[in-house]
Regions:
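Signature of N6-adenine DNA methyltransferases within the class I
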Residues: 1, 7-10, 14-108, 123-127, ...
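Acidic/polar loop patches that form or flank catalytic/metal-binding clefts of enzymes
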Residues: 39-45, 157-165, 238
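Segments forming glycine/polar-rich beta-alpha architectures that bind adenosine-containing cofactors
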Residues: 64-212, 327-345
Length: 345
């Protein structure tokens, strides 16, 4: 349709752009729907494959629907989202702003905590927040900068369309949703790149405040880290998770709580724990690198890759059909197990 016009005006095809600040992306999916049919079905990936059925996840598998869950299907600990400030940004600050606050009032230093979400976790960024739940009133009232910020928070909340948020205007020094654990926790990013083989995650000290761009498991055993950082868990996430553009959106209710993992013995847990510890030790060889650096598929250090592959083999040995020749076989096993585990629930 456009070819004659392009030829006439000597136009060429180029990258799409728009007026958005960061050039808003567009993802397009074209799907054909029809009645049940006995016609041949094909999946086109690296090559064309004739299949018996194409399910809702574009796999050659039965039409199983993975449904939201409020608790884990498998024997795994509870995962929860980080805390929500609902503050218009006035409880948050960068390093320079943090130093200015402390310079004005040294007593505020213990109440300014590191603040972390997906981007901070993956790319090693440093941000801070005012964490004032145990801060004495006389300290808060002695800092002019803090008083101004809290007034702005109160104003933001009082103008909210949500009644509950308006009530929180009376307590502008507090986060509206406080889920912060008082022990070390395992943090996973809500949104991460689709290019990585493994989900970047790390253990974080309880003094670091997790925000809602992260998922966390308080006091997570090492073997749980091993299961979640494994290839087979990543394959499950890629199949069932939501998307932001093409990036993965990790949800506890859709990904973690639905993940089918068999019941295993204490001996097997110990094997996973040992292999997972080796992954963490391999990371420690590169203190200058961020998780983004370590899990770049083209730059991943060989010792870290080897540690992950050893862990993958042990985690996958928990499943009945292991070893798996490819991700398709992993998914086939996972969906079968999911169907079995949810049959009576």
């Amino acid at each position: 349709l456009h070819y004659p016009l392009r030829r006439q005006r000597q136009m060429c095809i180029r990258d799409r752009s728009n007026n958005a600040k960061y050039n808003a992306g567009v993802t397009c999916v074209i799907i054909g729907l029809g009645w049940n049919s006995t016609k041949n079905k094909y999946i086109y990936a690296d090559k064309c494959k004739k299949v018996n059925n194409i399910n809702y996840y574009l796999l050659d598998a039965p039409n199983v629907i993975v449904e939201h869950r409020t608790s884990p299907l498998s024997e795994l600990p509870i995962m929860r989202k980080g805390s929500q400030p609902t503050d218009g940004g006035f409880l948050l600050m960068d390093k320079e702003e943090r130093n200015e606050f402390v310079l004005e009032n040294q007593k505020l230093a213990p109440y300014i905590r590191q603040y972390m979400g997906a981007d901070d976790l993956i790319n090693g960024k440093l941000r801070y927040c005012l964490w004032l739940k145990e801060c004495p009133e006389d300290i808060m009232s002695s800092c002019d900068k803090l008083i101004v910020r809290l007034k702005n928070v109160a104003n933001i909340r009082s103008n909210s369309t949500k009644e509950l948020t308006r009530k929180w205007a009376l307590k502008p020094h507090l986060f509206t949703e406080d889920r912060q654990p008082d022990m070390e926790y395992l943090m996973l990013p809500v949104v991460s790149s689709e290019k990585r083989q493994y989900i970047p995650m790390a253990y974080i000290d309880s003094t670091v405040i997790a925000n809602t761009n992260s998922q966390m498991i308080p006091d997570a055993p090492i073997y749980v880290f091993g299961v979640l950082t494994s290839l087979i868990h990543s394959v499950w996430m890629k199949a069932v998770c939501g998307r932001l553009e093409m990036r993965f959106a990790y949800s506890a209710s859709v990904v973690y709580n639905t993940f089918p993992f068999p019941s295993i013995s204490d001996t097997k847990k110990s094997e996973i724990e040992e292999a997972a510890t080796n992954v963490l030790l391999a990371r420690e060889n590169y203190p200058e690198k961020t998780l983004a650096d370590l899990y770049d598929p083209e730059k991943m250090p060989e010792d870290l890759r080897a540690a992950h592959e050893e862990l993958d083999a042990i985690v996958e040995s928990c499943y009945p059909d292991a070893p798996f020749p490819n991700d398709e076989a992993r998914l086939e096993c996972l969906f079968k197990l999911y169907e079995k585990m949810t049959a009576n629930k």
